[in-house]
Curated annotation (Swiss-Prot):
Zn(2+) binds at C29, C32, C48, C51. Pfam families: Carboxyl_trans (PF01039), Zn_ribbon_ACC (PF17848). GO terms for biological process: fatty acid biosynthetic process; malonyl-CoA biosynthetic process. Binds 1 zinc ion per subunit. InterPro entries: AcCoA_carboxyl_beta (IPR034733), Acetyl_CoA_COase_Trfase_b_su (IPR000438), ClpP/crotonase-like_dom_sf (IPR029045), COA_CT_N (IPR011762), Znf-ACC (IPR041010). HAMAP family: AcetylCoA_CT_beta. Gene3D superfamilies: 2-enoyl-CoA Hydratase, Chain A, domain 1. Its EC number is 2.1.3.15. Belongs to the AccD/PCCB family. Residues 25-294 form the CoA carboxyltransferase N-terminal domain. This is Acetyl-coenzyme A carboxylase carboxyl transferase subunit beta.
Amino acid sequence: MSWIERILNKSNITQTRKASIPEGVWTKCDSCGQVLYRAELERNLEVCPKCDHHMRMTARMRLHTLLDEGSEVELGSELEPKDVLKFKDSKKYKDRLVAAQKATGEKDALVVMKGTLYGMPIVAASFEFAFIGGSMSSVVGARFVRAVEQALEDNCPLVCFSASGGARMQEALMSLMQMAKTSAALAKLQERGLPYISVLTDPTMGGVSASLAMLGDINIAEPKALIGFAGPRVIEQTVREKLPPGFQRSEFLIEKGAIDMIVRRPEMRQTLASILSKLTNQPQPHFDEAAPVSEQENQADA
């Protein structure tokens, strides 16, 4: 042992350790790369306060932030997917289901709840994109029909938040059949004269965009959401042409008249309440809370 080691051993020195930061405290914006405090991002409804990028949000969080606190009642939670075709690609479908259920805590890619919005009774549905890309299965179709039936029973509006890659290929024709099934259910809602508002979020593609997502009495999109049937890369490869900038994004679609409105997520709740109060001939709700404002909007106002 050297002389310096002997001195150090004799002295009562407290060793310093690196301060460990718990996992999940910080996250990074997918768009601008800004490092964000996780709790602050959640308070801002998963919208980056720096660049206003709308990150993906869980289905359950969407519904909890939409409906009045304590009013939520889940519908169709007993419906579970089954691998009736014994489908297998690079992985067995039943194994994909187990993995998706474990990762998301959901049984399938659509969550349905009834409740109130500023005191107005509504039924709301939301896709869970993290569950096999929010793909439409027979259970998703059945839950959506359950949502329509509940709206008919309660004589109230229906709101649906779409975030999906389209029909679930592992269920083949049974999945494609849900396009017709959900569209037929919405026709009953229209016959009754009950409002259906469709909110398209990033991404809304394939069979979902070709059915229930574009059948709203009013179609609202979040900023810069990708909305279409086939993706832009597939279209470019097929037509062998360069697509225009922003093709299939919300801003492009509203210019072409394909959607009715673009609404920021923090303003969505109040916007939906205002629209539904007018469509159902109810008094305009009184809004106490103010929607969060991004740094981009602050700079624009200045």
